[in-house]
Amino acid sequence: MTESQETPITEDGEARPHRRIKSFVMRAGRMTEGQQRGLEQGGPLFILPLADSPVDYDQVFGRSAPRTLEIGFGMGHSLLEMAAAAPELDFIGVEVHRPGVGALLNGVLTQGLKNLRVYDCDAIEVLNRCVADNSLDRLMLFFPDPWHKARHHKRRIVQPEFAELVRRKLKVGGVFHMATDWEPYAEHMLEVMKVAPGYRNQAADGAYVPRPEERPITKFERRGERLGHGVWDLKFEKVD
């Protein structure tokens, strides 16, 4: 995700603040009863407000535990599965699409999970305003919008500025884990991360890692595998 490179000027000659190019488009969607239940009953319990200063997540969760943040969890199936499988870890999910937030929260309520919280706003704002530097053990970005057309590549969230923002938020030893089913985007991710300072690629061959066991396989991924489509996982560890 990048900022515009040109500073707009107002009619009176004053510089207008940059308007950041966003990596997502808000889409309207109909809610199921379960999604609506998740928002109405789970929202007050599990949706966190956008803060103006770093949040004390130990206080939010009532404990100190390794912390994972996922950007763009979609309908929440993978995040829900990971949180249920690892109650000793704390998870924060960020998603702007309300049906997905509702679906995740409905699952949280149904399973009685205590180790998951949600932001329903722009992930860049969450990282900049709510997450303290050197505080995350893992940041996950699974199947972000690849923005296929060349003129839209500037909207891809994985850009040098984003890699640096993630690095600041990770602890030393923390991992930035990305996955995509679009090979040109995987190549773009690798190009960005290979030259991003302060990271080490965990892949033995300096490219992609085998699918980690902790990342659940989605139904779309299974369908893609049947059709012969690939999935590329990248893991970069913060070393500085």
UniProtKB/Swiss-Prot annotation:
Catalytic reaction equation(s): guanosine(46) in tRNA + S-adenosyl-L-methionine = N(7)-methylguanosine(46) in tRNA + S-adenosyl-L-homocysteine
Transmembrane stretches, start-end: none
GO MF term set: tRNA (guanine(46)-N7)-methyltransferase activity
Functional pathway: tRNA modification; N(7)-methylguanine-tRNA biosynthesis
Gene Ontology cellular component terms for the protein in this record: tRNA methyltransferase complex
PROSITE patterns: SAM_MT_TRMB
Keyword tRNA processing included in the entry's annotation: yes
Catalytic site: D145
Record-listed S-adenosyl-L-methionine binding positions: E70, E95, D122, D145
EC number(s) given by UniProt: 2.1.1.33
Stated name of the protein: tRNA (guanine-N(7)-)-methyltransferase
Lineage: Bacteria, Pseudomonadati, Pseudomonadota, Gammaproteobacteria, Pseudomonadales
Originating gene: trmB
